[in-house]
């Protein structure tokens, strides 16, 4: 009879998955993570102990899980700004843009003006007000409708308005509105392209635009950067080893310079002490020679009789000097 136990597994043991699980929907709450080199800097600060590889793996999982949320919010600093989402403040009593040219409203009562004000505007009309406010801050002139600055401002208002809408929806339900986040991704990529073109064409206008719109622009990395956890961990470990090596070499160099300066100072002090001792011994030897009569201690300095010797030299020249034949007068 065939034994069925050979073909049926009755164990309830759970095997580990073949692929690692990454929670790519992590919510980022730390504004410091908006820096594109944040995780690389944190990897360099990890202590080099027996838990270094585990800490590096945990940091990599956090990096992968934060990329999606950072991609949606980092460029506009929306992690730090959660109240207004970078949108300009508009006075509630202000007349809506499409009714500003109506002369009838200038003499209308306050109750009528309130109906046409921003306070009574719909979400769509409020979005138009935000767009107009951002566009006015960067466009070149009043008739500017096709410049890159105007396009970037319009896309920025759209991104921030939709991000605010995603936040409002998230407070009512846990299900993420992917139909809206996908559109935000497309608009972000379109704005990134416009920023790159503006930066290549006019650096001054580019700096003015990102300053007026408060956009954090970072030059994108090359597509050859590492993707897998193992490659990223190895790259961070190599950078850490190089940094530690340079740091250690710098410390040894500073220590060597201090030791050299200390050795020079000690050598000069010893040389000075030996020279003083040598001068003292030489002075004692001279005193002994004076006592024994081998030498005499001179007082003052001898000066020869310059005038008398000069006169004697001139007289001898006149008496005994004979010039060579070539110098005689013909």
Curated annotation (Swiss-Prot):
InterPro entries xrefs: uS15_NS1_RNA-bd_sf (IPR009068), uS15_ribosomal (IPR052137)
Signal peptide: none
The keyword Ribosomal protein belongs to this UniProt entry's keyword annotation: yes
GO cellular component: mitochondrial small ribosomal subunit
Native source organism of the sequence: Caenorhabditis elegans
Subunit field text: Component of the mitochondrial ribosome small subunit (28S) which comprises a 12S rRNA and about 30 distinct proteins.
GO biological process, one term: mitochondrial translation
UniProt lineage: Eukaryota, Metazoa, Ecdysozoa, Nematoda, Chromadorea
Family label: Belongs to the universal ribosomal protein uS15 family.
GO MF annotation terms: structural constituent of ribosome
The keyword Disulfide bond is assigned to this record: no
Protein's name in the database: Small ribosomal subunit protein uS15m
PANTHER family linked to this entry: 28S RIBOSOMAL PROTEIN S15, MITOCHONDRIAL, SMALL RIBOSOMAL SUBUNIT PROTEIN US15M
